[in-house]
Amino acid sequence: VDERLRCNLNRDKHITIFGSSKQGKTCLRKHCLNKNDYILVQCSNRWSLSDLNANILKRAGYELTESTNVTYEGKAKVSASVKILDATLGGEAGGGATKNVTHRQLELDLSDVNDIIGALNEADFHQYIVLEDFHYLKSEVQKDFAIELKAFHESSKLCFIIVGVWLDENKLVIY
């Protein structure tokens, strides 16, 4: 099982690790991935799709604050800021490399997958995104996020690893 997961990590496709409770799903993930290779989002049963997307952005390094502008649905947009390290060679008399920190400010609609993809691309984010306990999300949120996964796959190089308790092999595909 370990080798099969490692092989699939190199395929640029989303991965689901599923099964019944207490079967070693999280242990498998921890065993096969280095901590620096992923961000971990622990799902909650109280989250909406926007909450899930906000948590992904926060774990990716964004600071989120509510904006005064609204989406076409009348919901408040979010102002997102991320620190970008720019390494410059040469620099001062010491001859070493210098690092400049710049902040990128974006205005996002957390329910728009295109905004989320754009923000992660803007931050030059390349880690795996692990969604642990995906089954805790409401069915509607699971369905909506399964649809977003298609956009993430087609419009970015981002790879999600979804860990959850269910027995249906096609759980996310049927959406």
Regions found by a protein language model. Name each.
Residues 2-129, 136-143, 157-158, 164:
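P-loop NTPase nucleotide-binding core
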Residues 56, 146-149, 173:
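Hydrophobic alpha-helical segments
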Residues 145-157:
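Conserved catalytic/switch belt of AAA+ P-loop NTPases
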Residues 168-175:
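Short regulatory helix/loop adjacent to the ATP-binding pocket of P-loop NTPases
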